[in-house]
Protein backbone atom coordinates (compact mmCIF):
# COMPACT_ATOMS: atom_id res chain seq x y z
CA UNK A 1 0.00 0.00 0.00
CA UNK A 2 1.65 3.30 -1.08
CA UNK A 3 2.37 5.95 1.55
CA UNK A 4 0.37 9.09 0.80
CA UNK A 5 0.78 11.18 3.95
CA UNK A 6 3.63 13.26 5.36
CA UNK A 7 5.03 12.73 8.84
CA UNK A 8 7.02 15.01 11.13
CA UNK A 9 8.76 14.64 14.47
CA UNK A 10 11.52 16.05 16.64
CA UNK A 11 14.48 13.81 15.81
CA UNK A 12 16.78 14.87 18.66
CA UNK A 13 16.59 13.66 22.25
CA UNK A 14 14.18 15.34 24.68
CA UNK A 15 15.52 18.25 26.71
CA UNK A 16 17.67 21.27 25.97
CA UNK A 17 20.61 21.19 23.59
CA UNK A 18 22.72 23.33 21.32
CA UNK A 19 20.91 22.00 18.25
CA UNK A 20 17.51 20.42 17.75
CA UNK A 21 16.25 18.75 14.59
CA UNK A 22 12.73 18.48 13.19
CA UNK A 23 12.47 15.82 10.49
CA UNK A 24 9.74 15.69 7.84
CA UNK A 25 9.17 12.87 5.34
CA UNK A 26 6.56 12.47 2.63
CA UNK A 27 5.10 14.12 -0.46
CA UNK A 28 4.39 17.45 1.27
CA UNK A 29 7.98 17.99 2.40
CA UNK A 30 8.74 20.43 -0.41
CA UNK A 31 5.55 22.46 0.22
CA UNK A 32 6.37 22.64 3.93
CA UNK A 33 9.87 23.87 3.06
CA UNK A 34 8.44 26.62 0.86
CA UNK A 35 5.97 27.70 3.56
CA UNK A 36 8.44 27.70 6.47
CA UNK A 37 11.55 28.88 4.61
CA UNK A 38 10.10 31.01 1.81
CA UNK A 39 11.59 28.65 -0.79
CA UNK A 40 12.88 25.08 -1.03
CA UNK A 41 16.68 24.94 -0.73
CA UNK A 42 18.73 23.12 -3.40
CA UNK A 43 18.77 19.33 -2.91
CA UNK A 44 21.32 18.04 -0.41
CA UNK A 45 22.77 21.48 0.31
CA UNK A 46 22.82 22.96 3.82
CA UNK A 47 21.17 26.40 3.69
CA UNK A 48 21.14 28.92 6.54
CA UNK A 49 17.61 30.36 6.49
CA UNK A 50 14.91 31.98 8.58
CA UNK A 51 12.12 29.70 9.88
CA UNK A 52 8.79 31.55 9.94
CA UNK A 53 5.30 30.88 11.30
CA UNK A 54 1.95 31.31 9.53
CA UNK A 55 2.10 35.11 10.10
CA UNK A 56 5.64 35.37 8.67
CA UNK A 57 6.99 36.01 12.17
CA UNK A 58 10.46 34.66 12.89
CA UNK A 59 10.57 31.36 14.77
CA UNK A 60 14.36 30.94 14.55
CA UNK A 61 17.24 30.90 12.11
CA UNK A 62 19.00 27.65 11.34
CA UNK A 63 20.07 25.06 8.81
CA UNK A 64 17.63 23.48 6.36
CA UNK A 65 18.46 20.48 4.16
CA UNK A 66 16.12 19.05 1.54
CA UNK A 67 16.59 15.46 0.29
CA UNK A 68 14.31 14.61 -2.63
CA UNK A 69 13.35 10.94 -2.85
CA UNK A 70 14.41 8.31 -3.52
CA UNK A 71 17.87 9.55 -2.48
CA UNK A 72 17.02 10.07 1.18
CA UNK A 73 16.93 8.12 4.44
CA UNK A 74 13.31 7.07 4.00
CA UNK A 75 13.31 6.93 0.20
CA UNK A 76 10.73 9.76 0.19
CA UNK A 77 11.13 13.53 0.02
CA UNK A 78 12.73 14.50 3.34
CA UNK A 79 13.24 17.91 4.96
CA UNK A 80 15.40 18.47 8.04
CA UNK A 81 15.20 21.71 9.99
CA UNK A 82 18.07 22.30 12.42
CA UNK A 83 17.38 25.04 14.97
CA UNK A 84 18.48 25.93 18.49
CA UNK A 85 17.64 22.97 20.69
CA UNK A 86 15.30 24.51 23.26
CA UNK A 87 12.24 22.30 23.97
CA UNK A 88 9.75 25.16 23.51
CA UNK A 89 11.33 26.22 20.22
CA UNK A 90 11.30 22.64 18.93
CA UNK A 91 7.61 22.33 19.75
CA UNK A 92 6.81 25.60 17.94
CA UNK A 93 8.66 24.41 14.84
CA UNK A 94 7.00 20.98 14.93
CA UNK A 95 3.58 22.58 15.42
CA UNK A 96 4.18 24.74 12.34
CA UNK A 97 4.90 21.61 10.25
CA UNK A 98 1.77 19.89 11.56
CA UNK A 99 -0.31 22.97 10.66
CA UNK A 100 0.97 22.61 7.10
CA UNK A 101 -0.46 19.10 6.73
CA UNK A 102 2.07 16.76 8.27
CA UNK A 103 1.03 14.42 11.06
CA UNK A 104 2.98 13.42 14.15
CA UNK A 105 5.19 10.45 13.32
CA UNK A 106 4.82 7.24 15.31
CA UNK A 107 7.84 5.65 17.05
CA UNK A 108 10.20 4.22 14.45
CA UNK A 109 8.07 5.34 11.52
CA UNK A 110 10.89 7.03 9.60
CA UNK A 111 12.98 3.85 9.76
CA UNK A 112 9.94 1.72 8.95
CA UNK A 113 9.42 3.75 5.78
CA UNK A 114 13.10 3.30 4.95
CA UNK A 115 12.62 -0.46 5.28
CA UNK A 116 9.41 -0.50 3.22
CA UNK A 117 11.14 1.54 0.51
CA UNK A 118 14.10 -0.90 0.40
CA UNK A 119 16.59 1.60 1.80
CA UNK A 120 17.40 -0.80 4.65
CA UNK A 121 16.66 -4.44 5.32
CA UNK A 122 15.13 -5.43 8.65
CA UNK A 123 18.42 -6.32 10.36
CA UNK A 124 19.84 -2.92 9.40
CA UNK A 125 16.68 -1.16 10.56
CA UNK A 126 16.96 -2.81 13.98
CA UNK A 127 20.62 -1.77 14.10
CA UNK A 128 19.54 1.89 13.95
CA UNK A 129 17.96 1.51 17.40
CA UNK A 130 20.91 -0.55 18.62
CA UNK A 131 23.40 2.17 17.63
CA UNK A 132 21.37 4.72 19.58
CA UNK A 133 21.00 2.50 22.66
CA UNK A 134 24.51 0.98 22.74
CA UNK A 135 25.87 1.11 26.30
CA UNK A 136 29.52 0.30 25.53
CA UNK A 137 32.07 1.10 22.85
CA UNK A 138 32.14 -2.54 21.75
CA UNK A 139 28.34 -2.60 21.46
CA UNK A 140 28.33 0.64 19.48
CA UNK A 141 30.96 -0.64 17.03
CA UNK A 142 29.16 -3.94 16.49
CA UNK A 143 25.85 -2.11 15.96
CA UNK A 144 27.48 0.10 13.32
CA UNK A 145 28.73 -3.03 11.56
CA UNK A 146 25.16 -4.34 11.44
CA UNK A 147 23.88 -0.98 10.22
CA UNK A 148 26.50 -0.93 7.46
CA UNK A 149 25.20 -4.30 6.26
CA UNK A 150 27.88 -6.76 7.47
CA UNK A 151 25.37 -8.99 9.28
CA UNK A 152 22.95 -8.84 6.35
CA UNK A 153 25.73 -9.73 3.92
CA UNK A 154 26.52 -12.88 5.93
CA UNK A 155 22.85 -13.83 5.97
CA UNK A 156 22.49 -13.21 2.23
CA UNK A 157 25.57 -15.36 1.58
CA UNK A 158 23.97 -18.23 3.50
CA UNK A 159 20.70 -17.68 1.65
CA UNK A 160 22.48 -17.91 -1.70
CA UNK A 161 24.14 -21.18 -0.72
CA UNK A 162 20.74 -22.55 0.29
CA UNK A 163 19.20 -21.36 -2.97
CA UNK A 164 21.98 -23.02 -4.98
CA UNK A 165 21.47 -26.28 -3.11
CA UNK A 166 17.70 -26.11 -3.53
CA UNK A 167 18.02 -25.45 -7.26
CA UNK A 168 20.29 -28.46 -7.65
CA UNK A 169 18.03 -30.79 -5.65
CA UNK A 170 14.77 -29.60 -7.19
CA UNK A 171 16.20 -29.83 -10.70
CA UNK A 172 16.82 -33.50 -10.04
CA UNK A 173 13.23 -33.86 -8.84
CA UNK A 174 11.77 -31.96 -11.81
CA UNK A 175 13.79 -33.84 -14.44
CA UNK A 176 13.90 -37.47 -13.30
CA UNK A 177 14.39 -38.61 -16.90
CA UNK A 178 17.92 -37.21 -16.75
CA UNK A 179 18.70 -39.99 -14.26
CA UNK A 180 21.02 -37.85 -12.11
CA UNK A 181 21.96 -39.76 -8.98
CA UNK A 182 22.86 -36.67 -6.98
CA UNK A 183 22.88 -38.51 -3.65
CA UNK A 184 25.49 -41.09 -4.63
CA UNK A 185 27.68 -38.39 -6.10
CA UNK A 186 27.99 -36.91 -2.64
CA UNK A 187 27.59 -33.39 -3.93
CA UNK A 188 24.45 -32.70 -1.90
CA UNK A 189 26.01 -33.84 1.37
CA UNK A 190 29.07 -31.74 0.60
CA UNK A 191 27.01 -28.64 -0.19
CA UNK A 192 24.87 -29.17 2.91
CA UNK A 193 28.02 -29.39 5.04
CA UNK A 194 29.20 -26.07 3.58
CA UNK A 195 25.91 -24.39 4.47
CA UNK A 196 25.96 -25.86 7.98
CA UNK A 197 29.55 -24.72 8.59
CA UNK A 198 28.68 -21.22 7.40
CA UNK A 199 25.64 -21.16 9.66
CA UNK A 200 27.68 -22.15 12.72
CA UNK A 201 30.21 -19.38 12.04
CA UNK A 202 27.45 -16.78 11.76
CA UNK A 203 25.75 -18.13 14.88
CA UNK A 204 28.93 -17.78 16.97
CA UNK A 205 29.39 -14.16 15.92
CA UNK A 206 25.69 -13.39 16.33
CA UNK A 207 25.71 -14.87 19.82
CA UNK A 208 28.56 -12.59 20.87
CA UNK A 209 26.75 -9.65 19.27
CA UNK A 210 23.65 -10.56 21.25
CA UNK A 211 25.68 -10.63 24.46
CA UNK A 212 27.05 -7.18 23.64
CA UNK A 213 23.47 -5.99 23.31
CA UNK A 214 21.74 -7.91 26.10
CA UNK A 215 24.59 -8.77 28.46
CA UNK A 216 25.24 -12.06 30.27
CA UNK A 217 23.04 -12.96 33.25
CA UNK A 218 25.29 -14.25 36.05
CA UNK A 219 23.66 -15.70 39.19
CA UNK A 220 25.59 -16.43 42.39
CA UNK A 221 24.20 -19.40 44.31
CA UNK A 222 25.23 -21.46 47.32
CA UNK A 223 24.70 -22.04 51.01
CA UNK A 224 24.60 -19.12 53.44
CA UNK A 225 27.91 -17.48 54.38
CA UNK A 226 30.02 -18.95 51.56
CA UNK A 227 30.95 -15.48 50.27
CA UNK A 228 28.41 -14.75 47.54
CA UNK A 229 27.97 -11.11 48.55
CA UNK A 230 31.73 -10.64 48.95
CA UNK A 231 32.27 -12.00 45.44
CA UNK A 232 29.59 -9.71 44.05
CA UNK A 233 31.29 -6.71 45.66
CA UNK A 234 34.66 -7.85 44.30
CA UNK A 235 33.29 -8.18 40.75
CA UNK A 236 31.46 -4.85 40.99
CA UNK A 237 34.48 -3.03 42.39
CA UNK A 238 32.34 -1.46 45.11
CA UNK A 239 30.18 -2.45 48.06
CA UNK A 240 26.75 -3.18 46.61
CA UNK A 241 25.82 -6.00 48.99
CA UNK A 242 26.01 -6.08 52.78
CA UNK A 243 28.61 -8.52 54.12
CA UNK A 244 28.50 -9.83 57.71
CA UNK A 245 29.61 -13.04 59.44
CA UNK A 246 25.93 -13.78 60.15
CA UNK A 247 24.53 -16.54 57.93
CA UNK A 248 21.42 -15.47 56.03
CA UNK A 249 22.31 -11.77 55.82
CA UNK A 250 21.19 -11.64 52.17
CA UNK A 251 17.46 -12.33 52.09
CA UNK A 252 16.58 -10.99 48.67
CA UNK A 253 18.14 -10.89 45.23
CA UNK A 254 20.55 -8.00 44.69
CA UNK A 255 21.37 -7.01 41.12
CA UNK A 256 24.23 -5.02 39.68
CA UNK A 257 25.64 -4.60 36.17
CA UNK A 258 29.33 -4.38 35.36
CA UNK A 259 31.37 -4.33 32.16
CA UNK A 260 34.38 -6.47 31.32
CA UNK A 261 36.06 -5.71 27.98
CA UNK A 262 32.83 -4.34 26.55
CA UNK A 263 30.67 -7.28 27.72
CA UNK A 264 27.93 -6.32 30.19
CA UNK A 265 27.47 -8.77 33.05
CA UNK A 266 24.20 -8.58 34.97
CA UNK A 267 25.17 -10.09 38.33
CA UNK A 268 22.56 -11.33 40.78
CA UNK A 269 23.45 -12.08 44.40
CA UNK A 270 20.93 -14.42 46.01
CA UNK A 271 19.78 -15.65 49.39
CA UNK A 272 21.72 -18.63 50.72
CA UNK A 273 20.02 -21.96 50.08
CA UNK A 274 19.16 -23.86 53.26
CA UNK A 275 16.23 -25.24 55.22
CA UNK A 276 14.69 -22.41 57.26
CA UNK A 277 11.51 -21.51 59.12
CA UNK A 278 12.08 -17.80 58.59
CA UNK A 279 9.27 -16.66 56.26
CA UNK A 280 11.24 -13.72 54.86
CA UNK A 281 14.24 -15.93 54.14
CA UNK A 282 11.96 -18.50 52.49
CA UNK A 283 10.71 -15.83 50.07
CA UNK A 284 14.32 -14.92 49.31
CA UNK A 285 15.21 -18.54 48.57
CA UNK A 286 12.22 -18.82 46.23
CA UNK A 287 13.52 -15.78 44.36
CA UNK A 288 16.91 -17.45 44.09
CA UNK A 289 15.41 -20.32 42.11
CA UNK A 290 13.45 -17.92 39.91
CA UNK A 291 16.63 -15.97 39.15
CA UNK A 292 18.33 -19.18 38.07
CA UNK A 293 15.58 -19.82 35.50
CA UNK A 294 16.81 -16.80 33.50
CA UNK A 295 20.53 -17.21 34.17
CA UNK A 296 23.13 -17.32 31.42
CA UNK A 297 25.67 -18.85 33.81
CA UNK A 298 25.52 -20.00 37.44
CA UNK A 299 28.37 -19.52 39.90
CA UNK A 300 28.11 -22.24 42.56
CA UNK A 301 30.04 -21.09 45.62
CA UNK A 302 31.47 -23.46 48.20
CA UNK A 303 33.81 -23.03 51.14
CA UNK A 304 37.24 -24.18 49.93
CA UNK A 305 37.85 -25.86 53.29
CA UNK A 306 34.75 -28.06 53.03
CA UNK A 307 34.48 -28.66 49.27
CA UNK A 308 31.41 -29.93 47.45
CA UNK A 309 29.01 -31.76 49.76
CA UNK A 310 25.50 -33.19 49.63
CA UNK A 311 23.84 -29.77 49.75
CA UNK A 312 25.88 -28.50 46.80
CA UNK A 313 25.15 -31.66 44.81
CA UNK A 314 21.42 -31.25 45.49
CA UNK A 315 21.63 -27.64 44.25
CA UNK A 316 23.42 -28.82 41.11
CA UNK A 317 20.75 -31.46 40.48
CA UNK A 318 18.03 -28.79 40.38
CA UNK A 319 19.81 -26.59 37.85
CA UNK A 320 18.98 -26.86 34.12
CA UNK A 321 21.40 -29.28 32.47
CA UNK A 322 22.20 -26.88 29.61
CA UNK A 323 23.04 -23.98 31.96
CA UNK A 324 26.81 -23.21 32.07
CA UNK A 325 28.10 -23.63 35.61
CA UNK A 326 31.31 -22.67 37.40
CA UNK A 327 32.26 -24.05 40.81
CA UNK A 328 33.80 -21.29 42.95
CA UNK A 329 35.95 -22.60 45.81
CA UNK A 330 36.08 -19.48 47.97
CA UNK A 331 38.10 -18.44 51.03
CA UNK A 332 41.47 -19.79 49.84
CA UNK A 333 43.06 -17.02 51.93
CA UNK A 334 42.07 -18.99 55.03
CA UNK A 335 43.71 -22.12 53.62
CA UNK A 336 46.84 -20.31 52.36
CA UNK A 337 46.48 -21.99 48.97
CA UNK A 338 47.15 -20.30 45.62
CA UNK A 339 44.40 -19.39 43.16
CA UNK A 340 43.87 -21.76 40.25
CA UNK A 341 41.42 -22.86 37.58
CA UNK A 342 40.95 -26.48 36.60
CA UNK A 343 38.59 -28.73 34.67
CA UNK A 344 37.20 -31.82 36.39
CA UNK A 345 34.76 -34.18 34.66
CA UNK A 346 33.77 -31.46 32.23
CA UNK A 347 33.14 -28.89 34.98
CA UNK A 348 35.11 -25.71 35.66
CA UNK A 349 36.48 -25.17 39.18
CA UNK A 350 38.04 -21.86 40.21
CA UNK A 351 39.82 -21.43 43.55
CA UNK A 352 39.85 -17.81 44.73
CA UNK A 353 39.38 -15.42 47.61
CA UNK A 354 36.41 -13.07 47.36
CA UNK A 355 37.72 -11.17 50.38
CA UNK A 356 41.18 -10.36 48.99
CA UNK A 357 40.36 -10.58 45.28
CA UNK A 358 43.09 -13.16 44.74
CA UNK A 359 42.11 -15.30 41.73
CA UNK A 360 39.08 -13.21 40.73
CA UNK A 361 40.85 -12.41 37.44
CA UNK A 362 40.51 -16.10 36.56
CA UNK A 363 36.75 -15.85 37.01
CA UNK A 364 36.51 -12.70 34.91
CA UNK A 365 38.37 -14.38 32.04
CA UNK A 366 36.22 -17.52 32.29
CA UNK A 367 33.05 -15.43 32.12
CA UNK A 368 34.39 -13.74 28.99
CA UNK A 369 35.09 -17.17 27.49
CA UNK A 370 31.50 -18.25 28.17
CA UNK A 371 30.27 -15.03 26.59
CA UNK A 372 32.30 -15.88 23.46
CA UNK A 373 34.36 -12.72 23.77
CA UNK A 374 36.97 -12.14 21.06
CA UNK A 375 39.92 -9.87 21.96
CA UNK A 376 39.91 -8.02 18.64
CA UNK A 377 36.14 -7.67 18.36
CA UNK A 378 36.65 -7.83 14.60
CA UNK A 379 33.71 -9.07 12.61
CA UNK A 380 31.28 -9.06 15.52
CA UNK A 381 27.91 -7.61 14.57
CA UNK A 382 24.93 -6.72 16.71
CA UNK A 383 22.28 -9.42 16.90
CA UNK A 384 18.97 -9.69 18.71
CA UNK A 385 17.33 -12.62 20.44
CA UNK A 386 14.96 -13.08 17.50
CA UNK A 387 17.97 -13.45 15.19
CA UNK A 388 19.38 -16.24 17.37
CA UNK A 389 15.98 -17.95 17.43
CA UNK A 390 15.81 -17.76 13.64
CA UNK A 391 19.34 -19.15 13.27
CA UNK A 392 18.47 -21.98 15.67
CA UNK A 393 15.41 -22.76 13.58
CA UNK A 394 17.59 -22.89 10.45
CA UNK A 395 19.96 -25.23 12.28
CA UNK A 396 17.06 -27.52 13.24
CA UNK A 397 15.82 -27.75 9.65
CA UNK A 398 19.31 -28.48 8.35
CA UNK A 399 19.75 -31.24 10.93
CA UNK A 400 16.46 -32.81 9.82
CA UNK A 401 17.50 -32.42 6.19
CA UNK A 402 20.78 -34.23 6.87
CA UNK A 403 18.78 -37.23 8.06
CA UNK A 404 16.66 -37.23 4.91
CA UNK A 405 19.31 -37.26 2.23
CA UNK A 406 17.81 -40.40 0.70
CA UNK A 407 14.31 -38.87 0.63
CA UNK A 408 14.73 -36.14 -1.95
CA UNK A 409 11.29 -34.51 -1.64
CA UNK A 410 11.42 -34.32 2.16
CA UNK A 411 15.01 -33.11 1.96
CA UNK A 412 13.99 -30.31 -0.43
CA UNK A 413 11.14 -29.27 1.88
CA UNK A 414 13.48 -28.91 4.87
CA UNK A 415 15.76 -26.72 2.77
CA UNK A 416 12.80 -24.51 1.89
CA UNK A 417 11.81 -24.17 5.55
CA UNK A 418 15.42 -23.35 6.47
CA UNK A 419 15.51 -20.61 3.84
CA UNK A 420 12.20 -19.15 5.07
CA UNK A 421 13.53 -19.02 8.65
CA UNK A 422 16.73 -17.34 7.48
CA UNK A 423 14.74 -14.78 5.49
CA UNK A 424 12.94 -13.53 8.61
CA UNK A 425 16.21 -11.97 9.81
CA UNK A 426 16.51 -9.51 6.93
CA UNK A 427 12.76 -9.19 6.42
CA UNK A 428 12.17 -10.93 3.10
CA UNK A 429 9.77 -13.28 4.89
CA UNK A 430 8.27 -11.46 7.89
CA UNK A 431 4.78 -10.95 9.32
CA UNK A 432 3.24 -7.50 9.76
CA UNK A 433 2.82 -8.22 13.48
CA UNK A 434 6.58 -8.66 13.86
CA UNK A 435 7.24 -5.41 12.00
CA UNK A 436 4.86 -3.57 14.31
CA UNK A 437 6.57 -5.00 17.38
CA UNK A 438 10.06 -4.09 16.13
CA UNK A 439 9.39 -0.49 15.08
CA UNK A 440 7.15 0.35 18.06
CA UNK A 441 10.26 0.15 20.27
CA UNK A 442 12.07 2.91 18.38
CA UNK A 443 12.12 6.47 19.63
CA UNK A 444 9.95 9.04 17.86
CA UNK A 445 11.90 10.79 15.13
CA UNK A 446 13.79 7.69 13.95
UniProtKB/Swiss-Prot annotation:
Cofactor(s) listed in the protein's UniProt record: K(+)
GO molecular function: GTP binding; GTPase activity; metal ion binding
Keyword Kinase (UniProt): no
Subcellular location: Cytoplasm
PROSITE patterns the record matches: G_TRME
Limits of the TrmE-type G domain: 215-372
Binding sites annotated in the UniProt record for GTP: 225-230, 244-250, 269-272, 353-355
GO biological process, one term: tRNA methylation
Cofactor: binding details: Binds 1 potassium ion per subunit.
Residues engaged in binding (6S)-5-formyl-5,6,7,8-tetrahydrofolate: 23, 80, 119, 446
Cysteine pairs bridged by disulfides in the record: none
Main location: cytoplasm
EC nos: 3.6.-.-
GO cellular component: cytosol
Subunit text: Homodimer. Heterotetramer of two MnmE and two MnmG subunits.
Family: Belongs to the TRAFAC class TrmE-Era-EngA-EngB-Septin-like GTPase superfamily. TrmE GTPase family.
Function of the protein: Exhibits a very high intrinsic GTPase hydrolysis rate. Involved in the addition of a carboxymethylaminomethyl (cmnm) group at the wobble position (U34) of certain tRNAs, forming tRNA-cmnm(5)s(2)U34.
Name listed for the protein in its UniProt record: tRNA modification GTPase MnmE
Species this protein is from: Methylobacillus flagellatus (strain ATCC 51484 / DSM 6875 / VKM B-1610 / KT)
Higher taxonomy: Bacteria, Pseudomonadati, Pseudomonadota, Betaproteobacteria, Nitrosomonadales
Gene responsible for this protein: mnmE
Amino acid sequence: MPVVDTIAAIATAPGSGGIGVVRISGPSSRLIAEAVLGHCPPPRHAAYLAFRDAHALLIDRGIAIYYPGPHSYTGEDVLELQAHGGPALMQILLKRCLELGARQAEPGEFTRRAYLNDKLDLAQAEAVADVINAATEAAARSAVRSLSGEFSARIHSLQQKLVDLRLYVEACLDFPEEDIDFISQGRVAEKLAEVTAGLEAVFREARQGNLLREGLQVVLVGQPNVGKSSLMNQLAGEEVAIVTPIAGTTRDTIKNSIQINGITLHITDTAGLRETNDEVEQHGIARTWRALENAGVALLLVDAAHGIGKVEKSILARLPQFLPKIWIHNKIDLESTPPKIEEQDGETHIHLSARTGDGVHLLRQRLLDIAGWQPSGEGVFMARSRHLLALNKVRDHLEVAAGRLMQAELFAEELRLAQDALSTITGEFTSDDLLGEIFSRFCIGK
